[in-house]
Amino acid sequence: MSSGPLYDTIGATYTLTRRTEPRIAARIWAALGDARTVLNVGAGTGSYEPSGRHVLAVEPSALMRSQRIPGAAPCLAGSAENLPFDDQSFDAAMAFSTIHHWQDPIAGLREMRRVARRAERGARPE
């Protein structure tokens, strides 16, 4: 995931300029269906993590990890292209507004599929 160095540079004001959009959050949560365990890849500050589920986050930027919102899921340092989890460890995996930053998006999506028990679902903001 190449966004680590980028967000270590520009992420200092991220929480001051970005807010969770309720419509987008609702679409993401609906797309997760009845998934109880969720991996959030390229998680940033955790603002789109669903409540009421067991979420674990992966984020490459130390600065973004340090700005996780109160109550956000535990977050590990890591890359989408090499997720440190066994096959089918989660009901679902999510990634919001991050894939375009990954060094190898195809590898990252394959990794998400590998660690998730169900096929991907997409939620696209309109």
Where on the chain are the PLM-derived regions?
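Conserved class I S-adenosyl-L-methionine
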Residues: 1-36, 47, 63-67
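Local beta-strand N-terminus motif with an aromatic residue
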Residues: 35, 90-91, 117
